[in-house]
């Protein structure tokens, strides 16, 4: 710690920070533009000027940029010095010479950092009366709108996009006061993290195009703390609603998880919530709409006296899955995961529970100095993990700078010292990945061969690990190099997962973790699982969806209740058809119109994450609560959307002719926690419904929320009472606590007086860029218990394909491989058409060129798909894009036959 003196007051700060960060962490206001907590300091904008003095006797001082000045012990500065204030005001005035006067029509208005800083400096009159420079805007795709005339040349966008996120297609062009930030030509931004430009940019150059179609100001939206359902990373989000529609998603700061950034699937994939074809009223197969009571009575009549299987879902909350389990009984509750996937998730859970190495948070991943990714294309399967791994490789430059006594926040100096030096990253994958540019070495092979390399790495680290027989010299040498790098590191990281449908990859990663622990390495093990609640569902229990369908087909059960799951996306259609035909009753509760919904005798409209509350468990084992953003019945009383657990419990009560016991979320959460030992901690994932600050509930709406009394004027001139939330500590109102002075974990939206932009998160943190003052949201359910794993010995044989027989393997796409986000219109523009990928050698042998139409038979399913030649894919492999339309599920690892050019 260090003592600095600010305007005569002695204050304790972190001496490793710069003055800007230190002062902001103290709650003091200094305007800034180019600095960002995740990007460091470059001193480009000159906005954060303060007066620095030699000591308490110095009355003259000198102006310095606070972001470029260390917070050294004994530093004397003044923020309120008149010369400094005049300097800061003049900087804003210079920026305004070319900035348009378009705040009323600018989509950044109301959450604009430039507006905040302009007000903070006191600039309120423009004296510049001459021609402004103008630019041509670009079409950057379906996610980002571009208005270059608003640029203030802070360089944040390119520093984030190129230096932080690793993008290559956004740059800066021009010179002096006429620079242009964009692409060489119009086109879709290629980075999977481009959406963060909308929050990184302090002005309205880059704005959310998905919000533009139905735009409103930030102060006119209703928010709630939520969790992204797009993958298993568990990123925290703030969805905003107006008039019963989700309008945008903003990043919600969690210092242990996503910090300041989201992937584009998580930010822009919310459109399925607003789809017109969603189930909104209970409906019979003939199209008859029912009310709430009639639907429950009908469902009870259909199910009474029958043996019911309940099929849950890894995209549904723990509470909803538990509600289904209580309805049908634990014996007849099924997880909803395909058999192979469930086995792999269970294996991952067992490994994490008993691993000798801890499970890292997303933020922890950034602090490792050697990484081995085994079998995962992280950018496509867990994008936010990929971004964290990219930051881990860049830690080498910071370490080199530290050795030269250069502060890590001096961004340009650190890069100059590092000269592109990176910590070692090794990637073993099917084909090329978006992280290859920062990898020391990459190897591409079949899943079995990747696993063999992993087992060989473990043996090279510790000879007591099982050896791999028949490994060729090249692979053995690679395994030795990977092992040497992991052992040489202070904090190595191993990342694997379930994606390639081969449990041997997880077992190999577990062996590496055990070997590293035996070498006394302070490492970590991270395992990627498929969906938002896959790990939580494995903790809750339940067999596979295959077993559920078998039970119906065999006559063991004659009724099916499906919760938030499309069975046709899990197992082959023929098996689903057989089970649904055998079932006397099929009831589906879901928030989206799926093929399974179309086959239901009764559909119950379930809440999406925006209309309900619940708990998810991320791949880290972190239980996190998501909260209802809005009540859909407020604007349309005919809507009967309810959380899955409410439907299930009400149906159970109707069947048993008993009163409803679970009247609020806390009741079902507590019951679920008691039923599954590993889920006992979920009650602590968020405050209870009784939580208050200064006697008030927490406001979902900003103080300036407008139009509430007029929103239903077209329905009735009589204003109803606002919805009452009995489930949580939040109010559907601006009436409640919304400030930053009182520490709290669950923050619906970031706002503080004078801070309307996302930079308002400064006011909620223990130190800027650190953690929330009340602690980061969520509770970890998995903590390392020491080494309780034995060596995994089932090492697969080498992949040796027979001529004319291929093996199907999955390629993943951030846009398209996840079910719900693929229903969002902007995301659909980014989803590729279905294809089949082959190695160049295989294409040559078949005599076909790129784009040729091929026919093939995989697991009994005939397909006709265009060819994509992949230079990195191994021989004997046929890659198919998982989740894309036309690609059947549960085929990966199966044999492919009849591969040939299709007859025209």
From Swiss-Prot:
What are the binding positions for [4Fe-4S] cluster 3 in this chain?
A: 228, 231, 235, 263
| Annotated SMART domains | Molybdop_Fe4S4, NADH-G_4Fe-4S_3
Which stretches make up the 4Fe-4S His(Cys)3-ligated-type domain?
Answer: 83-122
Q: Reaction(s) catalyzed by this protein?
A: a quinone + NADH + 5 H(+)(in) = a quinol + NAD(+) + 4 H(+)(out)
Which SUPFAM superfamilies did the record assign?
2Fe-2S ferredoxin-like, 4Fe-4S ferredoxins, Formate dehydrogenase/DMSO reductase, domains 1-3
Residues forming the 2Fe-2S ferredoxin-type domain are 1-83
Residues bound to [2Fe-2S] cluster are 34, 45, 48, 67
Q: Which cofactor does it need?
A: [2Fe-2S] cluster; [4Fe-4S] cluster
Q: What is its EC number?
A: 7.1.1.-
Belongs to which family?
A: Belongs to the complex I 75 kDa subunit family.
State the protein's name. NADH-quinone oxidoreductase subunit G
Instruction: Look up and give the organism this protein is from.
Output: Pseudomonas putida (strain ATCC 47054 / DSM 6125 / CFBP 8728 / NCIMB 11950 / KT2440)
Q: What is the lineage of its organism?
A: Bacteria, Pseudomonadati, Pseudomonadota, Gammaproteobacteria, Pseudomonadales
């Amino acid at each position: 710690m260090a003592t600095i003196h600010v305007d005569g007051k002695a204050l304790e700060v972190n001496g490793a920070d710069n003055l800007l960060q230190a002062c902001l962490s103290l709650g003091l206001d200094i305007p800034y533009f180019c600095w960002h907590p995740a990007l460091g300091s470059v001193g480009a904008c000159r906005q954060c000027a303060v007066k620095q003095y030699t000591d308490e006797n110095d009355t003259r001082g000198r102006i310095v940029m606070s972001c470029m000045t260390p917070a050294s012990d004994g530093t004397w500065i003044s923020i309120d010095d008149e010369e400094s204030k005049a300097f800061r005001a003049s900087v804003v005035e210079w920026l305004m010479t070319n900035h348009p006067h378009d705040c009323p029509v600018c989509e950044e208005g109301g959450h604009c950092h430039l507006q905040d800083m302009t007000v903070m400096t006191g600039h309120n009159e423009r004296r510049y009366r001459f021609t402004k420079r103008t630019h041509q805007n670009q079409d950057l795709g379906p996610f980002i709108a571009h208005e270059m005339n608003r640029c203030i040349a802070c360089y944040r966008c390119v520093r984030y996009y190129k230096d932080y996120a690793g993008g290559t297609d956004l740059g800066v062009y021009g010179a002096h006061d006429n620079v242009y930030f964009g692409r060489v030509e119009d086109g879709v931004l290629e980075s999977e993290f481009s959406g963060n430009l909308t929050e990184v940019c302090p002005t309205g150059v880059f704005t959310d195009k998905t919000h533009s179609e139905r735009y409103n100001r930030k102060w006119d939206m209703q928010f709630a703390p939520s969790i992204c359902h797009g993958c298993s990373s568990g990123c925290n989000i703030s969805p905003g609603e107006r008039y019963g529609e989700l309008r945008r998603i903003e990043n919600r700061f969690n210092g242990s998880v996503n910090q300041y950034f989201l992937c584009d699937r998580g930010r822009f994939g919310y459109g399925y919530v607003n789809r017109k074809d969603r189930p909104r009223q209970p409906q019979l197969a003939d199209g008859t709409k029912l009310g709430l009571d009639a639907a429950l009575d009908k469902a009870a009549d259909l199910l009474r006296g029958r043996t019911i299987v309940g099929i849950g879902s890894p995209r549904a909350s723990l509470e909803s899955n538990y509600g289904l389990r209580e309805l049908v009984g634990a014996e007849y509750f099924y997880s909803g995961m395909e058999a192979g996937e469930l086995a792999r998730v269970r294996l991952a859970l067992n490994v994490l529970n008993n691993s000798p190495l801890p499970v890292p948070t997303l933020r922890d991943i950034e602090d490792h100095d050697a990484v081995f990714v085994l079998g995962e294309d992280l950018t496509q399967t867990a994008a936010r993990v990929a971004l964290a791994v990219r930051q881990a490789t860049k830690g080498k430059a910071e370490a080199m700078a530290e050795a030269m006594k250069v502060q890590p926040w001096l961004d340009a100096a650190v890069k100059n010292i590092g000269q592109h030096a990176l910590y070692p990253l090794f990637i073993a994958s099917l084909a090329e990945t978006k992280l290859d540019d920062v990898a020391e070495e990459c190897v591409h092979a079949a899943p079995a061969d990747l696993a063999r390399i992993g087992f060989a790495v473990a043996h090279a680290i510790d000879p007591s690990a099982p050896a791999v027989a028949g490994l060729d010299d090249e692979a053995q040498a690679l395994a030795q190099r990977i092992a040497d790098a992991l052992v040489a590191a202070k904090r190595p990281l191993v990342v694997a997962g379930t994606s390639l449908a081969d449990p041997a990859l997880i077992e190999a990663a577990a062996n590496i973790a055990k070997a590293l622990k035996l070498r006394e390495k302070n490492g970590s093990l991270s395992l990627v699982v498929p969906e938002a609640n896959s790990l939580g569902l494995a903790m809750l229990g339940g067999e596979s969806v295959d077993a559920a369908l078998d039970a119906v087909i065999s006559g063991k059960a004659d009724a099916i209740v499906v919760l938030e799951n499309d069975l046709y996306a899990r197992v082959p259609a023929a098996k689903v058809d057989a089970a649904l035909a055998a079932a006397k009753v099929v009831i589906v509760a879901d928030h989206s119109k799926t093929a399974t919904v179309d086959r239901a005798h009764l559909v119950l409209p379930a809440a999406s994450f925006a209309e309900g509350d619940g708990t998810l468990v991320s791949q880290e084992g972190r239980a996190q609560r998501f909260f209802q953003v809005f009540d859909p019945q407020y604007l349309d009383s005919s809507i009967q959307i309810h959380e899955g657990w409410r439907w299930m419990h009400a149906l159970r009560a109707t069947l048993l002719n008993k009163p409803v016991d679970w009247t609020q979320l806390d009741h079902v959460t507590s019951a679920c926690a008691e039923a599954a030992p590993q889920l006992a901690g979920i009650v602590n994932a968020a405050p209870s419904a009784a939580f208050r600050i200064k006697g008030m509930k927490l406001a979902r709406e900003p103080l300036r929320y407008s139009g509430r009394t007029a929103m239903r004027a077209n329905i009735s001139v009589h204003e109803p009472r606002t919805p009452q939330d009995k489930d949580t500590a939040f109010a559907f109102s601006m009436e409640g606590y919304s400030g930053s002075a009182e520490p709290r974990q669950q923050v619906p939206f970031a706002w503080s007086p004078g801070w309307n932009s996302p930079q308002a998160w400064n006011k909620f943190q223990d130190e800027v860029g650190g953690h929330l003052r009340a602690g980061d949201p969520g509770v970890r359910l998995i903590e390392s218990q020491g080494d309780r794993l034995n060596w995994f010995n089932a090492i697969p044989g080498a992949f040796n394909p027979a001529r004319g027989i291929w093996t199907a393997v999955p390629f993943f796409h951030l846009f398209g491989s996840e079910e719900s986000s693929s229903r969002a219109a902007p995301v659909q523009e980014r989803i590729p058409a279905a294809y089949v990928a082959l190695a160049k050698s295989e294409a040559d042998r078949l005599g076909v060129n790129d784009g040729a139409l091929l026919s093939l038979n995989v697991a009994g399913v005939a397909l006709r798909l265009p060819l994509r030649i992949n230079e990195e894919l191994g021989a004997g492999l046929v890659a198919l894009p998982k989740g894309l339309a036309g690609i059947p599920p549960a085929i990966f690892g199966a044999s492919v036959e009849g591969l040939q050019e299709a007859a025209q």
